[in-house]
Design a protein with these regions (language model features):
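Glycine-rich segments within core transmembrane alpha-helices of 12-TM secondary carriers
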Residues: 162-188, 386-398
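Extracytoplasmic gate region of multi-pass secondary transporters
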Residues: 37-41, 251-305, 362, 366, ...
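Symmetry-related core transmembrane helices of the 12-TM Major Facilitator Superfamily/SLC fold
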Residues: 194-213, 427-445
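C-terminal ends and interior cores of transmembrane alpha-helices
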Residues: 93-123, 327-341
Length: 465
């Protein structure tokens, strides 16, 4: 008897990697905008008179709608109910709208001299409007992120799943790296902080078009799946139900990954928001080059995240990889907190080390979620993880660090390039980041113990032999 070999479009390496590259560009553009203001804190102080509290408030606005209005969770439910194509296009469009509002707020003079008091907080009107645009953008980029995660699972499950997720993260972080290393020179070349934001806006428009292109690929994949099942008796796949949310929330392994994610990203993303000023004020790096040192971190992950993802695919040890990454995070931030270690070469060494830790944890964490959660619930499961991450790492922690710097860490002022800047002592913030690493290590061990108990297979390879 001859066995019929049934293949789908996802079995073509060229097809699945092409699909990945298309959606990865959209995330590249999104990550660029997410961090484009990070090296501009000093320039915002000089040109727009933003202090560290203003900057921290603006940075924390990224998660406002995702956290308080639950837009991210709704986005995950929409993804599971409406599908990848609808959700991907919608989220890419929302990113463009948010970027446009942010650009207008920073570039216009209509808001000059105005201050708004909303609920309990008073900030310049320009800060509020820029924060609003960033919050709208945050909805789009986070929903796009969970959509792309589900895209990768759809195309790569049973293949190079962790490698694909690692490469997507690497391409996205190339956007972060370029933002950190190019936004300040671009702003200075054009004479205003709004210039790099305009470039981001144009890139996001191209990213929106990229999702239109992906939709054709996705339709072809669905058609090939239907064709491969002709003549077979296929049980209908269970649809997502609202009670599945309770099943996700009742999964202890999911909680450990979620808390680990929030703690890990709390130790990295908020740090990057303030890292350029840290390089200038503590390590004496010239302002034009200060963003290049934090830019080493995402550049390192471009190589290392796919490498560790490929290692997880072939060798396993996902929980152990997350433990090692957490240990490196602790080591790096503790050394950053030591005031006598203030030479620029030490900053480079620590940033490269942080890049290794930053590569280890996500390369194993994101591909582990499909081992714990059924595929029909993945969109909502990722959305809930991202919601907690938004609430803690992307909203609360940046605002908290900005408040700590403004309240407890001002030690005077300094003249840089002929202009006055506030001088900060970064010891307390670095110790806060260190504590996040310690807690992340605890939950990484708890996850490994839960995997041993439940048999999720986090320590097993992803590629089917």
């Amino acid at each position: 008897m001859t066995e019929i070999i049934r293949t789908t479009l996802r079995d073509s390496k060229a097809a699945r990697w092409t699909a990945l590259l298309i959606v990865a560009f959209t995330m590249f553009a999104g990550y660029y905008l997410a961090d484009v203001m990070s090296p501009l804190e000093g320039l915002l102080d000089k040109q727009l008179h933003w202090n560290s509290a203003d900057y921290g408030w603006f940075t924390g606005a990224y998660g406002w709608f995702n956290v308080f209005l639950f837009f991210l969770i709704f986005g995950g439910i929409i993804l599971d109910k409406m599908g990848i194509r609808f959700t991907g296009l919608t989220s890419a469009f929302v990113m463009v709208v948010g970027a446009a509002v942010k650009y207008w707020a920073v570039s216009t003079h209509m808001l000059d001299g105005m201050s708004w008091h909303i609920i309990f907080w008073s900030f310049p009107a320009q800060v509020w409007m820029a924060a609003l645009g960033f919050a709208v953008f945050g909805v789009g980029v986070e929903v796009a992120g969970i959509t792309v995660s589900k895209v990768i699972v759809k195309w790569f499950k049973g293949h190079e799943l962790a490698l694909a997720m690692g490469l997507q993260l690497a391409i996205a972080r190339l956007g972060t790296a370029l933002a950190l290393s190019t936004s300040l020179p671009i702003a200075k070349a054009f004479g205003h902080v709004s210039a790099p934001i305009l470039i981001c806006l144009l890139m996001l428009c191209i990213g929106l078009l990229a999702f239109f292109v992906y939709n054709f690929q996705d339709k072809k994949l669905d058609a090939s799946v239907v064709s491969s099942q002709e003549g077979l008796v296929i049980e209908p796949e269970e649809e997502f139900r609202m009670k599945d949310i309770l099943n996700i929330l009742g999964n202890k392994g999911w909680w450990y990954i979620t808390i680990l994610c929030a703690l890990f990203y709390s130790a990295v993303f908020p740090f990057l928001k303030f890292a350029t000023n840290l390089m200038i004020l503590k390590y004496g790096v010239a302002e034009n080059w200060a963003g290049s040192i934090p830019g080493l971190l995402p550049f390192g992950t471009i190589i290392l995240t796919p490498f560790f993802g490929n290692l997880y695919d072939k060798k396993g040890k996902g929980a152990s990889i997350m433990i090692l990454g957490s240990i490196i995070i602790i080591f790096v931030h503790f050394l950053f907190s030591l005031s006598f270690l203030n030479h620029w070469s030490i900053a480079i060494f620590l940033m490269i080390s942080l890049g290794i830790g930053f590569s280890l944890v996500p390369s194993a964490m994101w591909p582990s979620v499909p081992k714990i959660i059924p595929e029909r619930q993945l969109g909502t499961a990722y959305a809930l993880i991202f919601w907690v991450q938004n609430a803690v790492a992307l909203m609360f922690v940046p605002a908290f660090i900005g408040w700590v710097l403004h309240k407890y860490c001002i030690v005077g002022s300094v003249i840089i390039d002929g202009e006055k800047m506030t001088q900060y002592n970064y010891t307390i913030p670095m110790l806060i980041f260190t504590s996040f690493g310690v807690l992340a290590l605890v939950f990484a061990y708890l996850l490994k113990a839960e995997d041993k108990k439940k048999g999720y297979g986090l320590e097993l390879p992803n590629v089917k032999s």
